[in-house]
UniProtKB/Swiss-Prot annotation:
It comes from Zygosaccharomyces rouxii (strain ATCC 2623 / CBS 732 / NBRC 1130 / NCYC 568 / NRRL Y-229). This is Cx9C motif-containing protein 4, mitochondrial. A motif (Cx9C motif 2) lies at residues 29-39. It comes from the Eukaryota. The gene is CMC4. InterPro entries: CMC4, Cys_alpha_HP_mot_SF. The keyword Disulfide bond applies. One of its GO terms (cellular component) is mitochondrial intermembrane space. Pfam families: CMC4. Residues 5-47 form the CHCH domain.
């Protein structure tokens, strides 16, 4: 049986690649981080916050992080 790729893994990997490429300067990877958080938000909406993926913070922490970054939905 084929293993399924965890939700939002490409976005999580993009953050790792960005950090590596930018000498671990997180401020240069804001877009990649925002993309991951948006992906995670979509994932949790689709699973009624019951889905599990190693690539995303828990739903409560995700909401906090999105609010801090001004990414909350209107």
């Amino acid at each position: 049986m084929a293993q399924q790729t965890p939700s939002c893994k490409p976005q999580a990997c993009a953050i790792q690649n960005c950090l590596f490429s930018n000498n671990y300067n997180e401020s240069r990877c804001d877009q990649a981080i925002n993309d991951l958080y948006r992906c995670c938000e979509k994932f949790y909406k689709e699973t009624n916050s019951k889905g599990v993926t190693p690539c995303c913070p828990k739903p409560d922490l995700l909401r906090t992080k999105m609010t801090q970054r001004g990414l909350q939905e209107e």
